[in-house]
C-alpha cells in the first residue's frame, strides 16, 4: 500500500491541514510534497469545499488522507472544520496549490518546539512558484542575511512593520492556534482574512515566534488563486489589520494596555513594565527606520528619482 506508514499513524504529533476548492491540477503535487517529509508521525487533513473538477477522485487515491468534501460557508468555515478534526500537538497549514521544498521541515519544527518551551510558533521563508512549476524569487530574502528579532524581541519588529508571518509554512502549537484563530464571533475583517486575525491575536496576547533562516516551502502563482478571487475583500481587511496594530502600539506606549508574554502552555512568563516598554519603543523606532523605504532603496535609485523630480518641477515652471 502506498504510504503505508502514514496510514498506520494513530496518534499524530503533527496535523497538516489543507483547504481545497477546484484546484485538482495542483493537488497531487501538494499531497506528495507533504508525504515526502522525513518526519512520519503526522496526519494530513484536506477540507474540500465541494469541488467539481475531479478533486475527490484524486483524494481517493491516497488512503492515508483524512478528508471531507462539502460546501463551506467561507474560508474561515473550512479552517474551523480542519481544526475540529486535527489531533496533532502541532499544526501546519498548506494550501492546495502550495507545498514543501525542504523534506526535513516537520522534523525541524518538532525538534525546535520540543526544546524551546517559550516558543509557540516556528516559521521560515517561502519561495514563489509559477503555475507550471518554475521556482521564482524567495519572499523576504533579506532575512537570510539579516534575520528579524526572535521570541519576545519580535514584538517591537511586528509593531513597527505589521509583518504577517507566512502561513504556508509556520508550525504552531495546536492549543495556541485554536485559542487565537478567529471564530464566528471575531470582528468582520478577521472573519474575512482569518490569518490576519490569528496574527493579531497571537502577538497581542503575548506568544512568541522563532524564525529559521531557511527556504522551506513554495507558494504557487496561478489563475483563480485566493489572493486574486478575494482581493476586493481581503485588501480592506489588511488595511484594518494595519490600523489595529498601530492602535495597539499606541495603547502600549501610552500605558493603556498591559502586555504580557506567554510560553507555549499559555502561562504568563513576564509582564511589560515601564522600563521594558521604553526599550520596546526604542526598538520600535529603530525598526521603523531600518525598514523604511528610504533605507531599503539603493542610493543611485534615490538620486535618479530626486533628479527626475527636480526636472519635472523646473519643466513645469518653464511651461508657465
Predicted regions and their residues:
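N-proximal low-complexity "stem/linker" segments adjacent to membrane-targeting elements
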Residues: 1-33
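Conserved nucleotide-sugar donor-binding catalytic segment
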Residues: 16, 124, 143-238
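Short, acidic, metal-binding catalytic loop of nucleotide-sugar glycosyltransferases
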Residues: 32-41
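Short beta-strand/loop segment that forms part of the nucleotide-sugar
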Residues: 41-50, 68-71
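A conserved acidic beta->alpha catalytic loop
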Residues: 48-57, 95
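Glycine-rich, basic loop-to-helix element that forms the pyrophosphate-binding segment
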Residues: 70-86, 96
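Short aromatic/hydrophobic "clamp" motif used to bind/position activated sugar donors
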Residues: 91-92
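Conserved donor NDP-sugar-binding/catalytic core segment of glycosyltransferases
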Residues: 104-138
Amino acid at each position: 500500500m502506498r504510504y503505508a506508514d502514514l496510514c498506520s499513524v494513530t496518534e499524530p504529533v503533527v496535523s497538516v491541514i489543507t483547504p481545497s476548492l477546484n484546484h485538482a491540477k495542483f493537488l497531487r503535487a501538494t499531497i506528495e510534497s507533504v508525504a515526502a517529509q522525513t518526519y512520519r508521525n503526522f496526519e494530513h487533513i484536506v477540507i474540500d469545499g465541494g469541488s467539481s473538477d475531479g478533486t475527490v477522485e484524486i483524494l481517493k487515491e491516497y488512503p492515508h488522507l483524512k478528508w471531507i468534501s462539502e460546501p463551506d460557508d467561507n474560508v474561515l468555515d473550512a479552517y474551523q472544520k480542519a481544526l475540529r478534526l486535527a489531533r496533532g500537538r502541532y499544526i501546519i497549514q498548506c494550501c492546495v496549490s502550495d507545498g514543501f521544498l525542504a523534506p526535513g521541515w516537520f522534523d525541524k519544527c518538532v525538534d525546535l518546539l520540543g526544546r524551546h518551551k517559550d516558543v509557540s510558533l516556528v516559521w521560515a521563508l517561502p519561495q514563489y512558484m509559477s503555475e507550471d512549476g518554475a521556482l521564482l524569487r524567495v519572499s523576504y530574502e533579506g532575512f537570510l542575511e539579516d534575520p528579524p528579532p526572535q521570541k519576545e524581541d519580535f514584538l517591537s519588529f511586528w509593531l513597527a512593520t505589521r509583518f504577517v508571518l507566512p502561513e504556508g509554512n509556520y508550525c504552531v502549537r495546536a492549543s495556541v492556534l485554536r485559542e487565537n484563530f478567529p471564530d464566528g464571533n471575531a470582528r468582520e475583517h478577521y472573519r474575512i482574512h482569518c490569518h490576519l486575525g490569528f496574527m493579531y491575536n497571537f502577538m497581542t496576547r503575548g506568544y512568541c515566534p522563532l524564525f529559521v533562516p531557511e527556504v522551506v516551502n513554495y507558494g504557487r502563482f496561478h489563475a483563480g488563486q485566493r489572493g486574486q478571487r478575494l482581493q476586493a475583500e481581503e485588501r480592506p481587511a489588511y488595511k484594518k489589520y494595519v490600523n489595529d496594530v498601530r492602535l495597539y502600539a499606541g495603547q502600549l506606549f501610552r500605558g493603556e494596555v498591559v502586555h504580557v508574554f506567554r510560553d507555549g502552555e499559555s502561562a504568563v512568563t513576564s509582564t511589560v513594565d515601564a522600563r521594558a516598554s521604553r526599550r520596546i519603543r526604542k526598538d520600535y523606532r529603530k525598526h521603523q527606520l531600518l525598514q523604511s523605504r528610504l533605507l531599503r532603496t539603493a542610493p543611485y535609485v534615490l538620486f535618479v528619482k530626486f533628479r527626475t523630480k527636480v526636472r519635472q518641477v523646473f519643466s513645469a515652471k518653464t511651461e508657465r
